[in-house]
Structures are given as structure tokens and as C-alpha cells.
């Protein structure tokens, strides 16, 4: 009987570790800044980002601003050529669409593709911007939106 109890406890512990390992917790901190061809960008270096300057292009709640997106990847990742960017606030599961079906441009500023955009987020706090090329998530950028 002791063997079965030990086996059951071991299996439960193993199952718990498996479930814990599969849980992906997101880090709601502003994405890293990086340089590409002399431009400072916010995002994931060599994957996804947009030109960003914390003084000039900082996000303020309800204010629109221009942002040049840059994408890095293999040619087949850009077959769809249309980009959608959805935004989610850290305190709310509701998603809003910031960019819907905009076409990617050619290489620019060291990136494989680029895309100009106008974006505005409605309230302050941390936001996750999910950028899709076609139906595939290309990456996520976390931004802080300030009160004016």
C-alpha cells in the first residue's frame, strides 16, 4: 500500500510541475529599446519594433502619434503582407484593433519590412501590442501610456 501511495504522490508532483511549466506568464513591463541604423526602437531586437523616443513619441492617453513599424524575419513570414495590431490593457481583457490590414512596405532602416502607422491608446497604463502578419503573431511590444 505504501508503494501505491508513493507512486500516486510522485505522479501528482510530476503533473503539477508539468502544468506549471506550461503556464506562460507575461511580463507587463515596457519592452526594451534598441538601435537599428541610427534609430531608437521599442520592441524585440531583430524581430519587431517601431521608432520610439520617450520625449518626442511617448504615448499619452487619447493622443494619436505617428510610429514607423519595422519587421525582421524570413521571406515566407511576410507572404501575407497585411498587418493587424491588436492592443490589450494590463487591467482589462478587452482587445482593441489599432491597425487593421495595412500593407507592409519594403526593407527600411535595417529591417526586412516596414510600415507607417498612426496609433492612439485610450487610457494610461501598460498595453500589449500584438502584431500579426496575416493570421500569424509576429511579436508583441509592451508600451507604457502616460496621463497628459
Regions found by a protein language model. Name each.
Residues 25-120, 133-148:
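Contiguous segments within soluble domain cores/interaction surfaces
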Residues 123-125:
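Short tyrosine-centred short linear motifs in exposed loops/low-complexity segments
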Amino acid at each position: 500500500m505504501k508503494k501505491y501511495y508513493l507512486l500516486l504522490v510522485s505522479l501528482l508532483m510530476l503533473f503539477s510541475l508539468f502544468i506549471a511549466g506550461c503556464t506562460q506568464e507575461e511580463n507587463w513591463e515596457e519592452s526594451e529599446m534598441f538601435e537599428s541604423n541610427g534609430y531608437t526602437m521599442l520592441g524585440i531586437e531583430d524581430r519587431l519594433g517601431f521608432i520610439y523616443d520617450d520625449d518626442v513619441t511617448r504615448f499619452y492617453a487619447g493622443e494619436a502619434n505617428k510610429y514607423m513599424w519595422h519587421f525582421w524575419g524570413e521571406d515566407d513570414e511576410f507572404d501575407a503582407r497585411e498587418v493587424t495590431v491588436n492592443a490589450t490593457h494590463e487591467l482589462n481583457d478587452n482587445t482593441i484593433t489599432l491597425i487593421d490590414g495595412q500593407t507592409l512596405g519594403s526593407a527600411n532602416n535595417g529591417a526586412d519590412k516596414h510600415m507607417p502607422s498612426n496609433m492612439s491608446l485610450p487610457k494610461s497604463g501598460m498595453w500589449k501590442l500584438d502584431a500579426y502578419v496575416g493570421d500569424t503573431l509576429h511579436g508583441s511590444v509592451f508600451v507604457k501610456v502616460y496621463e497628459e
